[in-house]
């Protein structure tokens, strides 16, 4: 069972809120978020309500300040628990919108999109199996984008403001 605890102040101090399911609007429960304790499951946290804005992927552990989860500020307004998955992984990335241009299929992590794909930009994507995280920079750094099974015809469909993706990886069963 997944559970995350949000704290208004750093180092797990101040008002807090416990959550064990998806929540589209956390604003009634706390005004800011400066530390988080993930007691179970994998979670995607969003800067804005309704699963919008910056996204942060967190696994079990303690995050005493927002920089520990690569946060840009102390604002968390929605969250999603990522279902545990034990199957195979498969995803196709495309160099153009609407699944156009060069395509590559992946079943494993990719620490550098450019080294593998020879492009820095991914304009569309089809996730067939598993849950994935896109990262803005190589080596799993920078802004993060949660990718669940489905078709993403343009980069804004996964919440990005530009098509640059530096790396991606699978959300593995062992992370839970």
Swiss-Prot record:
Domain of life: Eukaryota
Coiled coil: none
InterPro entries: Beta/Gamma-Crystallin, Beta/gamma_crystallin, G_crystallin-like
Disulfide cysteine pairs (residue numbers): none
Biological process (GO), any one: visual perception
Domain topic, free-text comment: Has a two-domain beta-structure, folded into four very similar Greek key motifs.
Record-stated family: Belongs to the beta/gamma-crystallin family.
Subunit structure: Monomer.
Function: Crystallins are the dominant structural components of the vertebrate eye lens.
Protein name per UniProt: Gamma-crystallin M2
Organism: Chiloscyllium indicum (Slender bamboo shark)
């Amino acid at each position: 069972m997944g559970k995350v605890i949000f704290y208004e102040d750093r180092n797990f101090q101040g008002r807090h809120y416990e959550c064990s399911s998806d929540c589209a609007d956390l604003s009634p429960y706390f005004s800011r978020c400066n530390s988080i304790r993930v007691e179970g499951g994998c979670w995607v946290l969003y800067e804005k309500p309704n699963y919008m804005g910056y996204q942060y992927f967190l696994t079990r552990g303690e995050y005493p300040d927002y920089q520990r989860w690569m946060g840009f500020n102390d604002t968390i307004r929605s969250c999603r628990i990522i279902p545990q998955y034990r199957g195979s992984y498969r995803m196709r990335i495309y160099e153009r919108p609407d699944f156009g241009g060069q395509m590559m299929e992946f079943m494993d992590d990719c620490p550098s999109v450019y080294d593998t794909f020879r492009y820095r930009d991914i304009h569309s994507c089809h996730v067939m199996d598993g849950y994935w995280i896109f990262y803005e920079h190589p080596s799993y750094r920078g802004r993060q984008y949660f990718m669940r099974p489905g078709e993403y015809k343009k980069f804004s469909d996964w919440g990005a403001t530009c098509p640059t993706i530096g790396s991606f990886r699978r959300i593995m069963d062992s992370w839970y």
